[in-house]
């Protein structure tokens, strides 16, 4: 069974709203894995692998999970992606994750890059084997056959 949780916002992306070490939305996502300390991976492709969201993800999940970050842009911001970063050369490591959390940005750019690198196929395989799929905005759109998007302007 495939488990998908899509969000319009919130969670670790908005710590000023909930002011808790782990937000209720993130706790819900983690609980869907059925593991006490799951392997969780942030994918920021839609936002160009900006370092800020990746760093917030790692900080938010450090005490409750085993966080990692996947980057397709090959950025090497010291301390941002962490020692367990997943790059274009080792994308198969996504299959080791209990949860994959995809951030927002451009749905069209995200899908194009995933297809180019074969990440879309790997994520389908991961989902079929029980990896929980989570996403916010474009990161939520990517799990479905169709969606509305602002990727092409208004």
Question: What residue ranges belong to the model's regions?
Answer:
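Class I SAM-dependent methyltransferase SAM-binding "motif I" and its flanking Rossmann-like core
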Residues: 103, 111-154
């Amino acid at each position: 069974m495939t488990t998908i949780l899509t969000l319009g916002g919130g969670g670790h992306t908005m710590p000023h709203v909930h002011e808790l070490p782990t937000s209720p939305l993130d706790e819900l996502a983690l609980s869907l894995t059925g593991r006490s300390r799951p392997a969780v991976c942030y994918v920021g492709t839609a936002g160009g692998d900006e370092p800020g969201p990746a760093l917030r993800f790692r900080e938010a999940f450090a005490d409750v999970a085993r966080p990692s970050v996947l980057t397709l842009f090959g950025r090497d911001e010291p301390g941002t992606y962490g020692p367990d970063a997943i790059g274009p050369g080792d994308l198969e490591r996504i299959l080791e994750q209990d949860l994959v959390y995809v951030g927002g940005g451009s749905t069209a750019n995200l899908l194009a890059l995933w297809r180019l690198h074969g990440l879309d196929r790997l994520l389908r395989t991961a989902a079929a084997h029980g990896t929980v799929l989570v996403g916010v905005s474009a990161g939520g759109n990517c799990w479905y056959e169709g969606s509305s998007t602002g990727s092409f302007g208004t």
